[in-house]
Design a protein with these regions (language model features):
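Sec-dependent signal peptide recognition
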Residues: 2-9
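C-terminal motif of bacterial Sec signal peptides marking the signal peptidase cleavage site
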Residues: 14-15
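N-terminal post-signal-peptidase region of extra-cytosolic proteins
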Residues: 44-53, 58-59, 79-103, 122-127, ...
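Disulfide-braced loops of extracellular cysteine-rich modules
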Residues: 25-30
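Exported/periplasmic cell-wall-interacting domains
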Residues: 50, 96, 104-189
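Bacterial lipoprotein signal-peptidase II cleavage site
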Residues: 18-24
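Extracellular, cysteine-rich, disulfide-stabilized repeat modules with beta-strand cores
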Residues: 34-38
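Short Gly/aromatic-enriched secondary-structure transition segments
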Residues: 70-82
């Protein structure tokens, strides 16, 4: 947790391409239960109902959710502190790549709420065994650390997770309701 706070503070002091006013607009939009469109920079009404596909583009720091092939909503995300390479072993701080399923909802997460991603696959377990390493696990889509929700959209200024995909708590509230267990998730670089 101390590392998370230090990274956020450093990134805020160092400056970034998004202004304080823009973060305020994003947080106000999300707090009103609406969706921030990162492409247009506008607040929009969000579609109701469940989604059937999640796509995470690691290089763009963007998570998109779909229903019936139609884009429903996009989220700016923070990723693993270990860089853009695919997850290879436990503790590397990287986000895995591949196609998975959401396997469970966790209402008691240390990060507001979370959705467990079905990593590792049998193939990833076998590949890790051949390398003589543990593939790791506990990969989630989650909110901000408990009692740190005030950070809001600013959390995306730095990759701070241990290999998970992080969104704001308000965004996580929406995802938690809209994403059923079994939903396919594709993670690419």
């Amino acid at each position: 947790m101390k590392r998370f706070g230090a990274l956020i503070l450093f990134s805020l002091l160092a400056g970034c391409s998004v202004t304080s006013g823009e973060y305020g607009a994003i947080d106000s939009c999300l707090s009103a239960g609406q969706a921030w469109n990162y492409r247009t920079g506008k607040c929009e009404r969000t579609a109701e109902g469940s989604v059937d596909l999640i796509r995470v583009d690691k290089s763009a720091h963007l998570m998109s959710v779909y229903r019936g092939g139609q884009l429903v909503r996009e989220f700016r995300v923070a990723l693993g502190r270990g860089g853009q390479e695919p997850k290879m072993q436990q503790g590397d701080g990287r986000v895995p790549e591949g196609t998975y399923r959401i396997v469970s909802h966790n209402p008691n997460s240390a990060f507001h709420l979370s959705l467990r991603i079905g990593y590792p696959t049998a193939e990833q377990v076998a590949a890790a065994a051949r390398r003589g390493v543990n593939p790791g696990g506990d990969i989630m889509i989650h909110g901000l650390p408990n009692k740190k929700g005030w950070i809001g959209a600013k959390h995306t200024t730095v990759d701070w997770t241990d290999g998970c995909v992080a969104v704001t708590n308000t965004e996580m509230d929406w995802l938690y309701k809209a994403v059923p267990d079994g939903t396919r998730i594709e993670i690419t670089s």
